[in-house]
């Protein structure tokens, strides 16, 4: 279990690259809901925020979050970075959905825009991983005797 591995210190960090969904139905029907010709009410509640939960208990581990925002990108991403106890936050907009290219900002806890990365999603991901390796993984690696 990922949560157990994180809490027991077996994992050195977390890349919270995707939120499958922010909301879930309050009630789940056990069977298909048949059509009636009438509207149905769908009540939703927020899902648990895994990155925030693990970030609050990270200790010496590192946490990288991602924020897809439709407005006030940087401001909202920085608020998430702080609220989720992240070491870095990668921010982008909805134009990334179903696109082959992406543009992101990598933000630090002091509010700095570390860098802006643009290119194919693969190239952007490779650069993000290089930044994580350089700033978080290598920086916390024990120094050999």
What positions do the PLM features span?
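A cross-family phosphate/adenosyl-ligand binding-site feature
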Residues: 1-145
């Amino acid at each position: 279990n990922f949560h157990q591995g994180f809490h027991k210190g077996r994992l050195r960090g977390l890349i919270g690259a995707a939120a499958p969904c922010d909301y879930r139905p309050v009630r789940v029907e056990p069977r298909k809901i048949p059509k009636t010709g009438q509207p149905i009410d769908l009540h939703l509640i927020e899902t648990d925020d895994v990155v925030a939960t693990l970030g609050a208990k990270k200790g010496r581990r590192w946490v990288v979050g991602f924020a897809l925002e439709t407005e006030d990108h940087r401001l909202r991403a920085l608020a998430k970075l702080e609220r989720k106890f992240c070491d870095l936050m990668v921010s982008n907009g909805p134009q990334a959905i179903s696109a082959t290219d992406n543009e992101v900002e990598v933000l630090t806890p002091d509010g700095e825009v570390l860098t802006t990365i643009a290119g194919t999603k693969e190239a952007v991901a490779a650069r993000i991983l290089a930044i994580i390796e350089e700033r978080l993984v290598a920086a916390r690696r024990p120094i050999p005797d």
